[in-house]
Amino acid sequence: DKAMSSASLIKAFTMAASYENMEKIRIAEGMLLKADSASQTVTDKLFRLMENMVTYSDNESFNEMVRLQTASNQFNAGARVINRYLREQGYKETAVLHTLAPSNTDPEGLGSSNMTSVEDCGTLLEKIYRRECVSPEDSDQMLSLLLNQDTRTKIPGGLKESVQVAN
């Protein structure tokens, strides 16, 4: 088990950190939208961002979710919040270090490439499956997003249609 460039795998960790930090994210998004953080407008926007990031692997949604981790709406500050969460959860080889491209966001980061490991990925997915990631309800929502993943050619590509895959 060793750290490697994460590519889009980092989005699952950002999803987990975002569920953990959802109250602050709601406040940050409410400020941007000039809406109450508990409003349906904020709820709908955050759901679309999360769905686009996880289900459709949208890079700009990832960049925006990282920025929303703090009221400053700055990528590097948000990355530090996520990385603190990752350390607290025991993900030793995973870190958000850079924006993802292609996207509308100018390249920015704390380092060269986002990192993760096979062990960290397996641990996160197991926690989600066992309903132990943030809360049972949040785990269910995360699993639903993963089950609806739009890209079906890689991980589930060689499996029978009847096999349920969350990726």
Where are each of the predicted segments found?
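Structured, acidic catalytic/metal-binding patches in enzyme active sites
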Residues: 38, 56-58
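Small-residue-rich helix-loop
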Residues: 144-151
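Active-site SXXK
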Residues: 4-33, 53
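Mid-domain, small-residue-enriched loop/turn segments at the edges of structured enzyme/sensor domains
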Residues: 50, 60-133
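Short, Gly/Ser/Thr-enriched beta-strand-loop segments that form substrate-interacting elements
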Residues: 153-167
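Short, well-structured active-site flanking segments
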Residues: 19-47, 135-140
